[in-house]
Regions:
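Bacterial N-terminal signal peptides that target proteins for export
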Residues: 1-12, 21
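Intrinsically disordered, low-complexity segments enriched in serine, threonine, and glycine
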Residues: 184-275
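C-terminal segment of classical bacterial N-terminal signal peptides
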Residues: 16-25
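Short acidic, flexible loop segments centered on an aromatic residue
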Residues: 56-57, 61-87, 132, 197, ...
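Intrinsically disordered, low-complexity Pro/Gly/Ser/Thr-rich segments with frequent PxxP/GP/PP motifs
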Residues: 81-118, 218-245
Length: 275
């Protein structure tokens, strides 16, 4: 007969559910808002991250670094065996504080910077900063201590949100391309699917716009599309705006637009015919 192991349930209670908002200005999980949701450090100059508790109760969060890799579908997965570059990225990031308690509607700043060791090769280095909620311990009640049969456990999810922290050393360049544009259906609704490619020494980050002649607004748009340096290609499908679904046929132009200090820059553009 299989033995009952309560430790496994306790381990399950510590699992982290990681969520990210599609809005580039802020990310939120539970009652925590984080802004910005993407940090790029060029050289040794640091920056700040703003955290805000929009809930009604005091909340505590632990802040830590994680290594993650992007898969071709855009998912981020844990890194079981870090490369030397990933180890260097983790070692060079400095941040404080590492634990915060936020009263309701009281923002707080996190200071973050990078200190690259002498002799480190030029390139792009990336870690992910995790903000994980710490639940206050609950008092043990009489009802919880008197179980008629066996042992019962209440699993409390522990939520967190991550943001990428990118360090760029040297004069890094990147090129992008769009290929294999075609129409698909997702959940019974039209979507524009394509392959997004990247080459060069840095990642890319921007928004995809699907434009149709004679229509002012994009018939499909998605912000916050990244291709990190571990990938050269991603497969993407963007839902067509419900109000413009009838226009999802015939000639279109697909753009990948990156926001830079000088303004929007078109990284890639292609014409296609949707059928």
């Amino acid at each position: 007969m299989t033995s009952f192991d309560p430790a496994r349930l306790l381990i399950a209670a510590a699992c982290i559910a990681v969520m990210a908002s599609p809005t580039p200005a802020q990310a939120g999980v539970g009652d925590l808002l984080v802004a910005p949701t993407r940090i790029v450090l060029n050289g040794s100059r640091g920056t700040q991250i703003i955290l805000n508790n929009i809930g009604d109760d005091v909340a505590t969060y632990r802040i830590s670094l994680e290594l993650r890799r992007m898969t071709p579908d855009g998912s981020l997965v844990d890194v079981p065996a870090p490369s030397e570059a990933e180890k260097a990225a983790e070692a060079m990031i400095l941040y404080a504080p590492r634990k915060i308690t936020l009263p309701p509607n009281q923002p707080q700043t996190i200071n973050i910077a990078a200190r690259a060791p002498a002799g480190l090769a030029d390139g792009e280095y990336r870690v992910h900063l995790l903000f994980r909620a710490i639940h206050a311990p609950r008092p043990v009640t009489a009802a919880a201590t008197t179980a008629a049969k066996g042992i019962s456990f209440a699993l409390t999810p522990v939520y967190g949100v991550t943001i990428p922290v990118i360090v760029r050393l040297g004069n890094l360049q990147a090129k992008a391309g769009i290929a294999n544009v075609h129409l698909v259906r997702e959940g019974g609704k039209p979507a524009v699917a394509f392959d997004l490619t990247r080459s060069g020494s840095r990642s890319t980050f921007g928004e995809i716009r699907v434009m149709k002649a004679g229509i002012k607004d994009p018939i499909a748009i998605q912000r916050g599309i990244a291709i990190y340096t571990e990938l050269t290609q991603r497969s993407i499908a963007i839902p067509v705006d419900d109000k413009l679904a009838a226009a999802a046929t015939g000639p279109v132009t697909v753009q990948y637009v990156e926001t830079t200090e000088m303004g929007p820059e078109v990284l890639a553009e292609t014409a296609a015919v949707l059928r």
